[in-house]
Amino acid sequence: MEPDTATEAATVAVSDARATVVVVEDEQPGPSTFKEEGAAAAATEGTTATEKGEKKEKITSPFQLKLAAKASKSEKEMDPEYEEKMVNMPLKADRAKRFEFLLKQTELFAHFIQPSAQKSPTSPLNMKLARPRVKKDDKQSLISVGDYRHRRTEQEEDEELLSESRKTSNVCVRFEVSPSYVKGGPLRDYQIRGLNWLISLYENGVNGILADEMGLGKTLQTIALLGYLKHYRNIPGPHMVLVPKSTLHNWMNEFKRWVPSLRVICFVGDKDVRAAFIRDEMMPGEWDVCVTSYEMVIKEKSVFKKFHWRYLVIDEAHRIKNEKSKLSEIVREFKSTNRLLLTGTPLQNNLHELWALLNFLLPDVFNSADDFDSWFDTKNCLGDQKLVERLHAVLKPFLLRRIKTDVEKSLPPKKEIKIYLGLSKMQREWYTKILMKDIDVLNSSGKMDKMRLLNILMQLRKCCNHPYLFDGAEPGPPYTTDEHIVGNSGKMVALDKLLARIKEQGSRVLIFSQMTRLLDILEDYCMWRGYEYSRLDGQTPHEEREEAIDAFNAPNSSKFIFMLSTRAGGLGINLASADVVILYDSDWNPQVDLQAMDRAHRIGQKKPVRVFRLITDNTVEERIVERAEIKLRLDSIVIQQGRLIDQQSNKLAKEEMLQMIRHGATHVFACKESELTDEDIVTILERGEKKTAEMNERMQKMGESSLRNFRMDLEQSLYKFEGEDYREKQKLGTVEWIEPPKRERKANYAVDAYFREALRVSEPKIPKAPRPPKQPNVQDFQFFPPRLFELLEKEILYYRKTIGYKVPRNPEIPNPAIAQREEQKKIDGAEPLTPQETEEKDKLLTQGFTNWTKRDFNQFIKANEKYGRDDIDNIAREVEGKSPEEVMEYSAVFWERCNELQDIEKIMAQIERGEARIQRRISIKKALDAKIARYKAPFHQLRIQYGTSKGKNYTEEEDRFLICMLHKMGFDRENVYEELRQCVRNAPQFRFDWFIKSRTAMEFQRRCNTLISLIEKENMEIEERERAEKKKRATKTPMVKFSAFS
């Protein structure tokens, strides 16, 4: 049996002078109320609380309920619903206590607590600020004990007094210093206040949202709360902590560091690992806290639904803001006594998303979304100060938010510098191409497709980051890693200079980008420069994430750079060992960038944190950053007052996107050269610091109304007068026009060339030299005897002499005058063919392959490429209309006299490429045969030596199936990968493996090529070992034994 709760609290208070046990009666608990009493007074009050609370504990303790159920067996038999009633008694008591607490906070909760059947959604604009009227029969369940402002009848007052006299006092433990069970170090003052706030919520049966700014220790405060439940309330668990996959390792480490007395398990792994873990770890129940990820909860919801969780904690609570999402529906099905949401971003959701969070926390209070939406209408709420106060009053009991500047005075400062950079020549060319492709959109004034505008924005942002993000932009193949990676991007030029300076200063860097393909480029850059780095993005497996974070945070780590994707690496990861953050590109949502900065600027940081944001000047990026700054400033004004941002203000309008795209377009069109300069990094930083200060000063001066009315196109505001936009009227007649760049022409100062261009008269070509009219047309691929070509040439020269042909000068060849004289000399000295030569010519004309046409020759060359020069049978089948004997005869002459052909180099290169492919196929087939031959049952036994090249997506079972089926079907078959794709889809073991079933034939080909390379490498290693062993055995001298005969 569990010890009595109040007794436990008093006992701990006596033994631990750190805690103060306070009897709270009709007092509003909260983080701002603290009693300064000593341990002795705490023990005395705790004892008193124990005596007062005995009756209540005897009624509400589930263990005592079980004893009562055993003692009154006959009563249980008489009433079949007796047990259910007894179990629900403490839940009803908690609900009543919760309602009482909420009504003491503000009378507005009476509107939500009254039965929904007796009320309909009513706008608050039409209601008085008072308790809603209800039927007399319902008053018993709705009267708030803490509400003394309204007149009562005598009978009601008597009933209230009787009810008060029967109530017991609440026992609430509040800490003034760090609790003794927290072992990793003392809690800070504001963390102790946060812990007390969480305890007060628990004691009053209310769930809440801990929304401290990122880096203030929400994890630690939550762990301390669970430790309080175990050590002061004797409630060790079970508790569930639901976190993003990237933070699992961090949560486990924090539990071990701060409250090692809590027994914590981490639920993660593949299907087989999970099944064993459930059987061996979870079901025995030898644990207090289960830490798991969203994905695990969705996959194993049936297991988690078997437990009644004492506390259900969800980190990064914005994941359940949509009540219709799969995760949100599943966690609502879990049975839990208390719930806690953690989020590092303020409540900037629309009203319905806010209701979804509150409905998860208190479903019995916030059970109607329509009622909530009508009670706090967004438009009226933003305009009516009274309704703003009401909303603030509703959120106050559930929400605790502190920011670093208010509570953490010892944290080093954070300074952000925006570095403005120009475009390189290649970037400017691609930027112009993108704009020119959609110039009709830029110059349109009618309807625009929003998705098309978003796509243009995305392409322009890629160009600002690095032109190599576009296929075909990088020079190659072969692809090289050298200076061009830096020189073709303005941001990379600045980053290269900045990293060199940071390295000299002994600092370490976090680089964030939204584009994982850009991280690939940065990886190549780091390898080229010799910088040691770690990488984390959305595709990084959980184990590799842990290894990368641990390696970077290790003492005296040699890792200089940690590159992360903004979305995957911006949540819940502690990288305070770095003190420089570089935002390579900016997110649409400024809160995401703040989360990224807080990976370094958090508790534990010893150095001032410098944040460098790279921005390409006179491009769409400049407008994106400006819009984010305005949004962040507006949020800071509104949200910190407990208000909500208007949903429409967060949406990016089509007109706003169009103005972003248009911004800087004229500037880009006007200039074609690179804007990059040779400035040193100090000058660049000074200029960026100055521009950042100017922007911050401008934002500080702008009030809420100015920020709301701010538009990207400043000129447009000139056309607004008395609430009417005269620019829109003007657009009906005219359209804002961006002039595309003019077509460039090279200057040409040759007068003749100028007039030829003006009159469009092309320069006359040199006429072909005449040939005898009846001379036969012979081709080099027909392989006539060489003597025939000599006789034909002699005949041609004499014909030209007889017609008086003069050789023209050809300016395209070197030394045209000399060549002209020599050719004319041959013509002038030409002689006719003698009768013997004429007879010889006719005879030689029969000795070539006269029946072979150009088409036959091309078929012969392609067949040699396809089958190799030795496979005459297949080559003969490819040449249409020729017998195998004819092809064999031609092939023999071809390979003997191929050097006589004009394009022999090109032809031989074509054939040799084909033969190389044939040899490659043969070697692959041998490698597969050797690999398969090592196993009796390769479909089950085959193992692949991955080394460090294991992919992130394919499992070993999938790879084994691909290799075995490829060998079975024949590697060199036509359309083999399409057939392999069908086999995968029909395989029963993959019927639920949607990843591999959704791969294309091309993706299977790429994967098989990777696996074949690994197999070939493995075969080579085996062959080398065998050769070494043979050589070792051969070099051993045989031992000769001599025997003596007597």
From Swiss-Prot:
Catalytic reactions of this protein: ATP + H2O = ADP + phosphate + H(+)
Chain intervals with Low complexity compositional bias: 39-50
InterPro entries tied to this protein: Helicase_ATP-bd, Helicase_C-like, Homeodomain-like_sf, ISWI_HAND-dom, ISWI_HAND-dom_sf, P-loop_NTPase, SANT/Myb, SANT_dom
Amino acids binding ATP: 212-219
Disulfide-bonded cysteines: none
A GO cellular component annotation in the UniProt record: chromatin
This protein's name: SWI/SNF-related matrix-associated actin-dependent regulator of chromatin subfamily A member 1
Upper taxonomic lineage: Eukaryota, Metazoa, Chordata, Craniata, Vertebrata
